[in-house]
C-alpha cells in the first residue's frame, strides 16, 4: 500500500521533513516514489510547501496519508479539494 508520510531530513536537533509517497513497508527514511512537499516545524510559523496537484494524484490512486500528513493537508485545504473531487467523480459516474 502506498502511504503519504514524512521522512526526516536535517541536522541533529534541527529536524525538517519531506512529505513523500512511499510503500508502507519501507523504513521511514527508505526509498520513496516521489517527493510531494516539505515541512519545517522549527521556523515560526512552520514552513510548509506542497505539490498540491501531485498530492491529489496520489490520493486519487489510493494512497493513504498518515495522521500527521492528514492534519497538514486539512490545514491547507488539500483534503477538502480531494473530497470534492471524489464526490464530483462519484456523482458523474
UniProtKB/Swiss-Prot annotation:
The keyword S-adenosyl-L-methionine does not apply. GO terms for biological process: translation. PROSITE patterns: RIBOSOMAL_S16. Keywords: Ribonucleoprotein, Ribosomal protein. Pfam families: Ribosomal_S16 (PF00886). One of its GO terms (cellular component) is small ribosomal subunit. GO terms for molecular function: structural constituent of ribosome. InterPro entries: Ribosomal_bS16, Ribosomal_bS16_CS, Ribosomal_bS16_dom_sf. Belongs to the bacterial ribosomal protein bS16 family. NCBIfam families: S16. This is Small ribosomal subunit protein bS16. It comes from Dictyoglomus turgidum (strain DSM 6724 / Z-1310). The lineage of its organism: Bacteria, Pseudomonadati, Dictyoglomota, Dictyoglomia, Dictyoglomales. The gene is rpsP.
Amino acid at each position: 500500500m502506498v502511504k503519504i508520510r514524512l521522512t526526516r531530513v536535517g541536522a541533529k536537533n534541527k529536524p525538517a521533513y519531506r512529505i513523500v509517497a512511499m510503500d508502507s513497508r519501507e523504513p521511514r527514511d527508505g526509498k520513496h516514489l516521489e517527493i510531494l512537499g516539505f515541512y519545517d516545524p522549527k521556523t515560526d510559523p512552520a514552513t510548509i510547501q506542497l505539490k498540491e496537484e501531485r498530492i491529489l494524484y496520489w490520493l486519487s490512486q489510493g494512497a493513504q496519508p498518515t495522521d500527521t500528513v492528514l492534519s497538514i493537508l486539512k490545514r491547507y485545504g488539500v483534503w477538502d479539494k480531494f473530497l470534492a473531487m471524489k464526490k464530483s467523480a462519484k456523482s458523474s459516474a
